[in-house]
Design a protein with these regions (language model features):
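Cysteine-nucleophile active-site neighborhood
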Residues: 312-382, 386
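Short amphipathic alpha-helix with an adjacent loop that forms part of the alpha/beta core around
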Residues: 77-81, 247-252, 295-301
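Phosphate-binding active sites in nucleotide-utilizing proteins
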Residues: 259-321, 327-334
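Internal gly/pro-rich beta-alpha loop/helix module
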Residues: 129-251
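Beta-strand->loop->alpha-helix junctions that form or flank phosphate-binding loops
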Residues: 39-40, 176-184, 286-294
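Residues that mark the start of a beta-strand
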Residues: 5, 33-34, 258-260, 286, ...
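C-terminal and late-domain segments of enzyme folds
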Residues: 112, 254-257, 270-279, 286-288, ...
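ATP-dependent carboxylate-amine ligase catalytic core
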Residues: 2-19, 25-115, 123-150, 159-163
Length: 401
């Protein structure tokens, strides 16, 4: 399968991966190319910006949760869905080789190796010049299975500064695709779990367009496309949700023809993997969004509810005010309607969140805490194991009956 692609990586976090990757997606789209966006790992926030920049669903490539064997099929699926793209741009995670518990598992390098994707390193040039070439040399030689094909210089102080770094990289045979100057005009707000999601930030579309303009001015887009075209063909069939259900032993549902499933959405619930919706549809369900900030009741005829992730704690007052929907959710739960809740969804089902009344489906209170809980988790029951990921600053406390 022909699949032009690059992976945007860096020596460490905070060097500009998201700025460059998101801006590159926006710039390529503005130039008339169709971009398939991806993020290494389980993160929901960056794909929200990728989606805004590319006009397509932002997708994840997580080998820890999904397994190595699904990385290339998921990449191919995102490349051809909803229509074939011209290039796949994959944003890495942390430093190039950083992964689970220091093993490199799930790292950008692992995804690059598994999918045979050339790597473009974002070099934050602040505080040094030629030394950056030594760092990139280490990245390029640390693992012979990882192809460091190019570099983009970020936060360049002056043309002379950029030329010094580029000269060092040229000695390694690594071309520089662009030099982005230091600028304070591009700012994306952050809070306790990283960037503010694109769906919650009113200026996000304007800022993403600004990133695209910045990249278009300082990065050679044609050179990026040429580098992506060097990626070898993949001998793989795109992941298919219907086939995935069949291989998992799915035998249908007992809810009649085309049952309706509601999925929480809106500013308080922005976290959702597109493959979840695709699998529900492939399983014969109709899917409708429910915004707990504005919708006063669940849709008529609803037979299931999926409450994904987000930041309900940032909207707790408005969620509490919409008591009609909370009452409706609780009534449906008491009547036996299936509900799947994760992360923010669990918080919404508690009785209180930071003192604000929630749906009260579960006899628990939830509250924000200072401690960050982060990492992959494995849940096992009856010899069946499911891998998930925790990333939050909340606690739940069971209440006495």
């Amino acid at each position: 399968m022909r699949l032009p692609r690059i992976l945007i990586a860096a020596p460490a976090s905070g060097g500009g991966k998201t700025t460059v990757a998101t801006g590159l997606m926006a710039a390529l789209r503005a130039s008339g190319r169709t971009v398939a966006p991806f993020k290494v790992g389980p993160d929901y926030i960056d794909p929200g910006y990728h989606s805004m920049a590319s006009g397509r669903p932002g997708r994840n490539l997580d080998s820890v949760m999904c397994g190595d064997e699904l990385m290339a099929p998921l990449l191919a699926h995102g490349f051809v869905t909803p229509d074939p793209a011209d290039i796949a741009v994959i944003e890495g995670v942390m430093g190039l080789f950083d992964g689970q518990l220091g093993t490199g598992r799930g790292s950008s390098a692992e995804i690059a190796t598994t999918t045979r994707t050339p790597v473009v390193v974002v070099v934050d040039t602040a505080h040094a010049s030629l030394t950056h070439a030594a760092v990139v040399a280490g990245l390029a030689t640390f693992d012979p299975d990882v192809t460091v094909a190019g570099a983009i210089l970020n936060r360049v102080a002056s043309p002379r500064h950029g030329a010094e770094v580029a000269r060092g990289l040229a000695q390694l045979g690594i071309p520089v695709l662009g030099q982005i100057p230091r600028t304070e005009s591009i700012f994306v707000p952050s809070r306790h779990l990283g960037l503010v999601p694109a769906g919650e930030w009113e200026d996000s579309a304007t800022k993403v367009a600004g990133l695209g303009g910045l990249i278009a001015e300082y990065v050679d887009l044609d050179a990026v496309m040429d580098m992506a075209a060097t990626a070898p063909d993949l001998d793989v069939e795109p992941w298919d949700p219907a086939a995935a259900l069949e291989s998992a032993g799915w035998q249908g549902h007992p809810f009649g023809e085309s049952p309706l499933v509601g999925m929480f959405a809106g500013r308080a619930f922005t976290f959702r993997y597109p493959e979840t919706t695709e699998m529900l549809i492939a399983a014969g369900f109709r899917v409708v969004d429910v915004d707990p900030l504005t919708d006063r009741r669940l849709p008529d005829g609803i037979q299931g509810l999926y409450l994904g992730g987000g930041f309900p704690q940032m909207h707790a007052t408005d969620l509490e005010t919409n008591s009609e929907l909370a009452d409706d959710v609780r009534s449906h739960a008491e009547a036996g309607m299936p509900i799947v809740a994760e992360c923010a969804g669990l918080l919404y089902l508690c009785r209180h969140l930071d003192g604000h009344e929630m749906a009260g489906v579960l006899p628990m209170d939830a509250a924000m805490a200072k401690r960050l809980t982060m990492g992959y988790r494995v849940a096992t029951r009856d010899s069946i194991s499911v891998v998930g990921h925790e990333f939050h600053r909340t606690t739940t406390t069971p209440l006495a009956d």
